From Swiss-Prot:
Involved in the biosynthesis of one of the two 2,6-deoxysugars, dTDP-L-oleandrose, attached to the macrolactone ring oleandolide to produce the aglycone antibiotic oleandomycin. NADPH is the better reductant, however NADH can also be used. GO terms for biological process: antibiotic biosynthetic process. Transmembrane segments: none annotated. Keywords: Antibiotic biosynthesis, NADP, Oxidoreductase. The gene is oleW. This is dTDP-3,4-didehydro-2,6-dideoxy-alpha-D-glucose 3-reductase. The active site is at K98 (proton donor). Substrate binds at R20, Y236, T256. Gene3D superfamilies: Dihydrodipicolinate Reductase, domain 2, NAD(P)-binding Rossmann-like Domain. NADP(+) binds at S38, R39, L75, H80, R166, D178. The keyword Protein transport does not apply.
Amino acid sequence: MPSPRLRFGVLGAADIALRRTVPALLAHPDVTVVAVSSRDTARAARFAAAFGCEAVPGHQALLDRDDIDALYVPLPVMVHTPWVEAALLRGRHVLVEKPLTATRSGAEDLIALARSRGLVLMENFTSLHHAQHGTVTDLLRDGTIGELRSLSAAFTIPPKPEGDIRYQPDVGGGALLDIGIYPLRAALHFLGPDLHAAGAVLRRERRRNVVVSGHVLLTTPHGVVAELAFGMEHAYRSEYTLFGTAGRLRLDRAFTPPETHRPRVEIHRQDALDIVDLPPDAQFANLVRDFVLAVREGPGRLTQHHADAVRQADLVERVMAVARVRWC
């Protein structure tokens, strides 16, 4: 007998939910989207009409429903904790936008609550679910560029409209939490968990008191270095390069590739360039698949996922602790 479909509620009619995540949820044969909530009833109604679900006025009303198994929470990071906690206390599985929280203690507390109740809590960090990074990892493991010496990663985007949530530091958290988290996570993925924050410069806009860009320097205990750049006042850039003793690997469109994108891994060696062409991959669909599997098979599948989320939050705090702020 097939398992019943997983009934999702969407806590917030965010743009990422509309464009990417909810279509991926609905494309999974074992998922249905029941309702969406928003403080803006007209926005919720438009969202619901687009996906054939019910519009609910206010997030608490969605939490109080009895026909929801899981909640997708695309709210701004600085309000994640109260709503994720409330959802877990109501017995709901939770898929929450990255980052889970802005602090290590906050991440640990939510993960502990989910585990104590046997519930799935997953961070919606979709780029981690794209197959291109596995290919790069395999090339590194095979010694394609010799011993790894450094990583350079950048994720930058053009300025957003004036009212964008990213410019509200007490809600959206600014560029470090929304954009800088991508190169930070790449450093954790390729260089391992024992990263030291050697320094950082954060460019903070005086008018809105929000971080709009930054550079971070990380090191491992063995001296491998990561140089990271991020921001929302630049031309678009989404890439990383791994430098080794015998060459370098470069990947463009590393963090937010569309489903139609055909990745190309560049392998640069002395006087030679090789290209590894990869097929398109649907990272949002992959994440939804993994979430459903965790619900069906048990949250024990997420032990490494949770450890990585805690390390990520810890690294963010350590970067902020050493950062020098430059006002603009």
